[in-house]
């Protein structure tokens, strides 16, 4: 199999949902699935997106003057031309995603004390491009910008010392209605229980401005390697559906649409397990989020029997951060494979040269073992 991660991240490049490059990636994945002998189905869907019209920028005006690293928030409101200037005040924590993305929040204040805009610091480090989760989008169309953790630390030091912190910030974007994306499915029919299904999935879009090598071309490559392993080995008893989801970076629109339509058709109860591969191209260990406990025990038995052992960290707290979550909400056993840590997450530096091909191979082998175990023979 060719270097799929290289093709998606380098030859095609950034693949924001609804773009022509995302559509090119969908066609490439569909063709690869056909070459593997899978029966391919494509599910188009429309969604509400957002595109930047001015980049996120923050300039420190007091107690010193300098530029501050800034990232865009998808679905942010727009600042007026010329930006917004005001005093910075710490206003608490923004709970973008419970137990995971809980970030320090600052307001840019007008002279009368009203909030003009918000600066939210990435507790994990750099000023990345990120999305305002449902909670963040409920409170009007205020301008939001992502800061880095170092700026948060600086603000805390200055405010604790009683110093005034002033900034000028700018960001602008437009909501785009009717953007088109696709879920691409490759089907490997079951030999004796074809009405029961195992879903193996990975999203193929990337965040704005990022080549998305690790997030998530690596997951797509791992998924297709599993498909290759399954197609060339003993046929599974249950049907295995390999799904490349679109628009994951826009709040998992692709997987949410797929789950909703399967539920409408009365087909959701066919799905017995879901294995999701997201960012498996780097890291010193494999982080596996899995629920319920019975599914975790099956994973552990598979990993214990593998000839090539590698560090695995288990977590049972399933969060709305990737495409396994809509299935989990419907009570379906799920597992997400993630390589961690990865310092180039959601940045323009998430490129092919950062990828460890051996990590992809090992993740694919581990997941293949799990899929074979739950799909039966």
Where do the protein language model's features map onto the residues?
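N-terminal capping segment at the start of a domain
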Residues: 1-23, 36, 43-45, 55-57, ...
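Extracytoplasmic/secreted proteins, especially bacterial periplasmic and envelope-associated proteins
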Residues: 3, 7, 24-35, 150-154, ...
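Soluble metallo-hydrolase cores and metallopeptidase-like ectodomains found primarily
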Residues: 61, 75-90, 132-213, 225-228, ...
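Solvent-exposed loop/turn segments at secondary-structure junctions
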Residues: 46-48, 123-127, 151-152, 175, ...
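Active-site-adjacent substrate-binding region
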Residues: 137, 282-377
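Structural recognition of the beta-strand scaffold that forms the well-ordered cores
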Residues: 7, 42, 117-121, 146, ...
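Noncatalytic luminal/extracellular "stalk/propeptide" segments of secretory-pathway proteins
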Residues: 3-106
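Acidic/histidine-rich catalytic neighborhood of metal-dependent amide-processing enzymes
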Residues: 180-183, 206-302, 320
């Amino acid at each position: 199999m060719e270097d799929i991660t290289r093709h998606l991240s380098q030859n095609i490049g950034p693949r924001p949902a609804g773009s022509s490059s995302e559509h090119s990636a969908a066609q490439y994945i569909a063709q690869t699935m056909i070459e593997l002998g899978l029966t391919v189905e494509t599910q188009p869907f429309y969604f509400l997106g957002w595109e930047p019209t001015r980049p996120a920028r923050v300039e420190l005006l007091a107690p010193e003057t300098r530029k501050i690293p800034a990232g865009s928030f998808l679905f942010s409101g727009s600042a007026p031309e010329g930006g917004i200037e005001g005093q910075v005040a710490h206003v608490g924590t923004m709970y973008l995603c419970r137990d995971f993305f809980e970030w320090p929040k600052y307001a840019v204040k007008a002279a009368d004390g009203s909030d003009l805009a918000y600066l939210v610091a990435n507790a994990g480090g750099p000023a990345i491009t990120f999305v305002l989760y449902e909670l963040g989008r409920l409170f009007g169309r205020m301008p939001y910008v992502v800061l880095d953790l170092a700026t948060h630390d600086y603000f805390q030091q200055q405010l604790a010392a009683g110093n005034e912190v002033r900034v000028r910030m700018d960001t602008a974007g437009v909501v785009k209605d009717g953007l088109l994306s696709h879920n691409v499915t490759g089907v490997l029919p079951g030999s004796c229980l074809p009405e029961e299904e195992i879903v193996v999935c990975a999203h193929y879009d990337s965040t704005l401005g990022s080549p998305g090598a690790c997030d998530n071309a690596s997951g797509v490559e791992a998924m297709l390697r599993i498909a290759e392993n399954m197609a060339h080995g003993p046929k599974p008893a249950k049907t295995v559906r390999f799904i490349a989801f679109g628009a994951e970076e826009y709040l998992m629109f692709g997987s949410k649409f797929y789950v909703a339509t399967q539920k409408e058709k009365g087909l959701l109860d066919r799905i017995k397990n879901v294995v999701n591969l997201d960012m498996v191209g780097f890291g010193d260990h494999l982080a596996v989020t899995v629920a319920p406990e019975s599914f975790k025990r099956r994973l552990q038995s598979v990993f214990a029997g593998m000839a090539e052992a590698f560090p695995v960290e288990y977590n049972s707290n399933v969060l709305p951060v990737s495409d396994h979550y809509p299935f989990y909400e419907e009570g379906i056993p799920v597992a997400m494979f993630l390589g961690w840590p990865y310092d180039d997450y959601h940045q323009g530096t998430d490129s092919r040269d950062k990828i460890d091909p051996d990590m992809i191979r090992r993740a694919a082998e581990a997941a293949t073992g799990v899929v074979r175990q739950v799909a039966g023979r």
